[in-house]
Amino acid sequence: MKSKHLFSLASVAMFVVVIAFGVRIYRVGDSARKEKAHWKKLDRILSEANFEGSYLLAKDGKILISSGRGDLSYDNKKVSDEKSRSTDPENDPNKIGRESTVAINSLTKQFTGVAIYQLANEGKLSLDATIGTYLSDCPYGDRITLKQLLEMKSGLPDYALEQALRDKYGDAIYSGMDPASLRADVMALTLKETPGEKFEYTNTNYFLLGLIIEKVSGESYENYITAHLLKPIGMRHTGFDWNLAAVRPFDPSKQGDGREFSHVFTFSAGEMTSTVLDLYQWQKYLYGGGFPGIVPQELFTDGGYHMGLNEKDGVFRHAGATHLYRSNMLYDTKTGDQVILLGRSPESDLNELTTELKEWIDELETAH
């Protein structure tokens, strides 16, 4: 009788273990299915946005995925398609990947902003000083401070949108013009608003900051940024001039490679090129306190725009757009999450796509 009772207990125990094991298998399988579906959703999001370029998503400071979509060149694609080449992105050197260099447009502005803060911390300039302190030949130099330039409150118009300036240079906007001539034209602009009163995004502000960096440091803008910002982080694939970028701009009007603004024209407001991997390191370094005294989350006290960045609720982001390139970057200081998009999709809304991808990262936790 006793042995019979023990046998019954053993049977029940085994049954419970089997059931529990079965439930565990079901849960693991269900979790795997959810996760697989979530990754399929990512591909769908990118496809529906018609995104072409490189992208990187990071959660808790760690890269989830870094890859690319599309061909490096549309002109090369036409030739290659005629030869029926393989389109395997893992083996095709003509496909955009995570190490492909792309024009980053106005993401350049945060590098300019950090450089200004570096020079201020070294006592070489003051954010409260006027432009004229450093650029003595600037007609409006005694009315605008460096801080107002950083915060887009100078009251100046956007030189890049001035029709008279575009008419003057014509094709040289793409092929390149004399830097001294462009500098003189930017200096000749007249105020639209009273400095300090109104926020208005304008490339002129960061163009002028680039000139101040050159004047104060005694180096060219490009040399200063390379030596003091890029090299300390190891950003070996970041540079200047879109002509040297691997990803060629796409011109929808001719369904082929197009031309982008000259790096002389965009200068310190938007001339840089980079990769998603380099920018991932940049954001980790910047928000992690790599530059002493220049931690964005400590400098931004009430949100808004400053030093080439927008901030709201601890999330920093900025967009970039030139003639044919588009870019967008996000960093969440609360989680270390990152979204980096470097594309040549002039008809895509990368602001909306960045928001969608951040939501996808947030939802990843529930997909496990």
Predicted regions and their residues:
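Catalytic loop of the DD-peptidase/beta-lactamase superfamily, centered on the K-T-G motif
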Residues: K2-S11, F15-G68, S84, E260-H368
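Active-site-proximal loop and beta-strand segments within enzyme catalytic domains
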Residues: D71-E200
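Short, surface-exposed loop or secondary-structure junction motifs
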Residues: I144-H323, S327-N328
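Helix N-cap/coil-helix junction residues
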Residues: F51, K124-L125, E219, M235
